[in-house]
Structures are given as C-alpha cells and as structure tokens.
Amino acid sequence: MTVSNSTDPDKNHISYRTSGVDIDAGNRLVEIIKPFAQRTLRPEALGGIGGFGALFEVPGKYRQPVLVSGTDGVGTKLKLAFQYARHATIGIDLVAMSVNDILVQGAEPLFFLDYFACGKLDVETAAQVIQGIAHGCEQAGCALIGGETAEMPGMYPEGEYDLAGFAVGVVEKDQIIDGSSIRENDLVLGIASSGPHSNGFSLIRKILDRHAGQPDTGLDETWLVDALLAPTRIYVKSILALLAELPVKGLAHITGGGLLENIPRILPDSVMAHIDQSAWVRPPLFDWLQQHGNVTDEEMLHVFNCGIGMIVIVAPEHALTATNILRSGGETVWQIGDIKSRKPGTPSIVIT
C-alpha cells in the first residue's frame, strides 16, 4: 500500500521517531525474540507471537479445570541489573515470581505474558531480557505467548526499564491446595532458595550504599553481585512431580514479608507453625547483609527468605518420601519445623 504525501516537503516535519518512538526498532526486537518464544510453546498454544491476542486451549486432560492467575514484577532488583549491566537473567526472576505464586495452589503454569517498558528502546538489552524470560518459561514448562514492549520517551531515565509479568495456570477443582487440611503434627519442609530472589532489594541497596568504597566489606564485589543477582529459583517441575506422587497440604512461596508473613497465609486459624532456624544452613550472603546493615533478627525474617524459597507442609508419614522426591528433582530440602495447635490470640508462627 502507498500513501501519498500532501504536505510541503520543504517544511521540518515531526515524526514518531523524532518524538522518541522507533517503531522499526520495536519490529526488529520482535523478530529477534521470536525464536526464543518459539522454544517455549506448548501444543495448546494456537498461533504465534504478533497477533492482537494470544490463543491458548485449556488442556483436555482436566475434568474440572480451574484457571489460576498471578502477576508480579522484579522490584528494585532491577536497579542492580542496570548498575552492573546484568540483563540476561532478570527475565528469569520475572517468570519465577508469578509461576511460583500460582504453583502454591497446585496449578500447572500454562502460559506467560510480559510487559517491558522503557524511555528509549535498546534492542540488544531488551533482547537479553526477553531471552531470559523465555528461559524462565522453559524452566517452568509454560509458553511465552505474548507481551508488550512500550517505548515511552521521558518516562524512564536513560538505560533503565521496568518489567511486569502475568502467568496463568490450571488445577483440578478437587486438587486445589489451600491449606485447609493442615493439622497439628504435620511437618514443615523448606526448599532452598538461590539467594534473596526478588525481594528486599530496597534494603539491600541501602546497605550497599552505606558500605560503597569501603575495603572491609568482607566479600569480593564480584561474588557479592553474583550472589545478589542470582535468578529466583523456579520450583515448578520439582513441586509438580511431588504433587503427582502424594498429597501436599500446604505450599508457601517465600517472597515479600519473608518467613514471618508468608507461612501464616496458608494456615488455618486453629494451628500455628513452629520453625527451627538451626534446621537449615543460612547462606553467607544473608549473614553479610545482617552484619553490615545492622539488621535485627526479626527484620531479617520479615524481609528476606533467609535461604528458604518454598515451604511444603505434609503429613508426618509423607515427609521422607516428599523429601526424596524433591531431592531427586534437584532441590535442597530440610525438615525445618512442625505444626502445633493454636489458642486464640496467640501467634500463628514462632521462629526459634
């Protein structure tokens, strides 16, 4: 199709590109990321990337399918990614935050969509980020079926961007995990995290700022950055393998609020969790953060996962089998506590 130009060619014309939005750059990005997305596709995905909407057929193996959705971002962990030009794994964090959330209700993640917003689109950087998103989707077994790249001049500082993700999964109606069956004497298993995951970075950055340039930080800077920016662990495949073998009473993704807030979210009012901190090995990174930030024990447990990224609650007779299944799936697992009866007005969690 041709469009005639009736304006005076001698005048200085304003275009979308001169206004700060490069449509051609956006199109180049789409072509670059298509192969990454293609590797994530499942048989239920109908069509490819580029349509107005993404189509996905609910798997036929479910009798009473219930869709479970979740959305999240990466928070100020992005600031460290910008500072150290580490863009290749931040997309894994984005996927992990949503798929781990829907996983705790027993849902199998089906598909994922992303939102990438920036002031000026750097195609190379955006491609690294979205390749990481695709890698996260592969780890979670879900399809990257669409997304949005928004170039918005004046909205973000140069070199910075923001991310949001959206995941949808499915679970049988009679297999939804909601914690309602948790009883006294059930056991609490903790699965190791890969680091802080994507929470607590405003506090982390404050600690780093306080000690910037000081020679006595106690850790090599490269090691420290690697530890902080380690991508959030995706627990989907190991947890789904566990759910296929035995009944799980409760799951909790340890995100913002730490152990203190996230475990009580799944407990009935009649019980409380007793957690023993000596039962697992807290990674040295958290010791460094606590020491150099002069952070209280309670604040650490309220902000960080402290080395535990996912909680699994099972009946005592299933604990050993559950541990073995999770370990065979590559997880590091500890029995970190148990469930006790709770009297009205008493705490829903005690960590000693």
From Swiss-Prot:
Entry's Gene Ontology molecular function annotations: ATP binding; phosphoribosylamine-glycine ligase activity; phosphoribosylformylglycinamidine cyclo-ligase activity
Statement: the UniProt record of this protein carries the keyword Phosphoprotein: no
GO cellular component terms, semicolon-separated: cytosol
GO biological process terms on file: 'de novo' IMP biosynthetic process; adenine biosynthetic process
Sorted UniProt keywords: ATP-binding, Cytoplasm, Ligase, Nucleotide-binding, Purine biosynthesis
One Pfam family from the record: AIRS_C
Catalytic activity: 2-formamido-N(1)-(5-O-phospho-beta-D-ribosyl)acetamidine + ATP = 5-amino-1-(5-phospho-beta-D-ribosyl)imidazole + ADP + phosphate + H(+)
Keyword Nucleotide-binding applies: yes
UniProt-listed CDD domains: PurM (cd02196)
InterPro entries (UniProt xref): PurM-like_C_dom, PurM-like_C_sf, PurM-like_N, PurM-like_N_sf, PurM_cligase
Top enzyme category: ligase
Classification via PANTHER family: TRIFUNCTIONAL PURINE BIOSYNTHETIC PROTEIN ADENOSINE-3, TRIFUNCTIONAL PURINE BIOSYNTHETIC PROTEIN ADENOSINE-3-RELATED
Entry's family note: Belongs to the AIR synthase family.
Protein name per UniProt: Phosphoribosylformylglycinamidine cyclo-ligase
Organism of provenance: Nitrosomonas eutropha (strain DSM 101675 / C91 / Nm57)
